[in-house]
A protein has these predicted regions:
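Bacterial N-terminal signal peptides
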Residues: 5-15
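N-terminal periplasmic/intermembrane-space "pro-region" immediately following the signal or transit peptide
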Residues: 16-104, 406, 411, 416-418
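Gram-negative outer-membrane beta-barrel domains
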Residues: 49, 55-58, 62-67, 301-304, ...
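Detector for outer-membrane/organellar transmembrane beta-barrel domains
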Residues: 227-231, 254-359, 363, 409
């Protein structure tokens, strides 16, 4: 019996490894079959995928995510809407009985609160960087200045229909060289150093030369920049202050704008046309030689300018020439960002009385203090003295003295000079 007890455990011990080996083989066989079956299924699916995948129709709308795109650019993004209000009070020490300050372009009223001009300016300039070659500008104007700037029936056939339009022109950049800018319409004249908007001027009142030379033209203005130092312009227009031509003759102007150094700008213009009304048997010519130079150092404290003008006019070829010549000098000191002081002196020889209706020599000097309260509000306090070599002004005097307070507001997206 003891021998039997030893034999049975030994047999069981030898049998267990044999049973485990059989089970492992069965499991491995089963795994191999499963892997083979899975491979067959994957092969069948790969063959069925091209057949069963739905085909999108050619004209099917894109997925919602594809519809989303960048918003369209704002068409008014580069358009500026601007406005200015320019009013004044002037006192003439001659106390003219008609309340009129003589030889003044804008500040014509004595001892009266007055509106020089209220203007709206809409502008969309060309932008080659944005791929836009066209643009335009519209200046609507109301107030006393319209009577000066628009002219009368002496030079306009129908002044009333253009009265409120100071400027209205379209622009196109011709793809020629650096870009030829062509403007068509009514635009402010660049003859003379001064321009229309008071906020951009050293003085409140305007010079004799601003008052005498053309205010505006209607026609073509072409500008070409040769480089950063030289620009040329050519005008083909109806004439001086003519929205509608009254003699059928087109006036031309040739301009050069040079910037030899950063602090100096020089303008030179030759302007020629016919200013006599048709019919004239042998019409003469009106010639203007105008030049001015501006100096402004980098520190921005000082600005100085000189202007010289010479004009000849003949209504008929064989009549004696009527000449007007002279010039002006300007100096401004920007004491602080808010305070500036400026002076102007000018001389005008009205040899045939074209400007003042009397052959005389006119001079004037002006002193102006400017206080800029903010970007958009400015006050100018000014003293001016006009004088002649002949008794010309009210009450038979040779001089006219005025004191003026001008208040100017402006706002809008346009930066720099208007």
């Amino acid at each position: 019996m003891p021998a039997l007890h030893l034999f049975l455990p030994l047999c069981l011990t030898l049998a267990l490894p044999a049973q485990e080996s059989v089970r492992e083989r069965e499991l491995q066989t089963r795994i191999d079959k499963l892997e083979q079956r899975l491979a067959e299924i994957e092969a069948k699916l790969s063959l069925l995928a091209p057949i069963t995948a739905p085909k999108a129709p050619e004209n099917a709308p894109p997925a919602p995510s594809a519809v989303l795109k960048e918003a369209e650019p704002n068409p008014y993004r580069n358009t500026t809407f601007n406005a200015t209000l320019d009013g004044y009070y002037a006192f003439n020490f001659n106390r003219p009985f008609d309340g009129n300050n003589q030889l003044r372009a804008f500040d014509q009223s004595h001892n009266s609160f007055s509106l020089n001009q209220a203007a709206l300016v809409l502008e969309r300039a060309p932008n080659l960087d944005a791929g836009r070659r066209f643009g335009g500008r519209l200046d609507l104007q109301f107030g006393q200045a319209t009577q000066t700037l628009q002219g009368s029936r002496a030079n306009e056939n129908r002044p009333e229909i253009y009265r409120a339009i100071f400027q209205a022109y379209g622009t196109f950049i011709v793809p020629l060289g650096s870009g030829l800018q062509a403007d068509f319409g009514k635009f402010a004249s660049s003859l003379g150093y001064e321009n229309n908007y008071t906020k951009d001027q050293m003085n409140y009142s305007r010079s004799y030369w601003f008052n005498y030379l053309p205010f505006y033209h209607f026609g073509f203005r072409n500008t070409y920049n040769f480089n950063s130092k030289l620009t040329a312009q050519y005008w083909l227009v109806n004439g001086s202050n003519q929205s509608e031509d009254f003699n059928g003759f087109k006036t031309q102007a040739f301009l050069l704008i040079a910037k030899p150094i950063k602090t100096v700008t020089w303008n030179a213009t030759y302007y020629v046309g016919q200013e006599g009304r048709a019919p004239l048997a042998d019409p003469g010519r009106f010639h203007v030689f105008d030049t001015y130079i501006n100096w402004s150092p980098a520190n921005g404290k000082w600005t100085a300018a000189l202007e010289a003008d010479y004009t000849i006019n003949r209504n008929n070829t064989h009549e004696a020439p009527a000449r007007v010549d002279g010039g002006a000098a300007y100096l401004q000191y920007q004491a602080t960002p808010k305070f500036a002081f400026a002076g102007r002196f000018e001389l005008l020889h009205d040899r045939a009385g074209i400007f003042s209706e009397k052959a005389q020599t006119l001079k004037e000097f002006t002193l102006t203090g400017t206080r800029t309260f903010a970007d958009g509000f400015q006050a100018k306090l000014e003293y001016r003295r006009d004088f002649s070599n002949l008794p010309y002004f009210a009450t038979g005097k040779r001089n006219q003295d005025t004191a003026t307070l001008g208040l100017i507001w402006w706002f809008g997206g346009k930066t720099g000079a208007w």
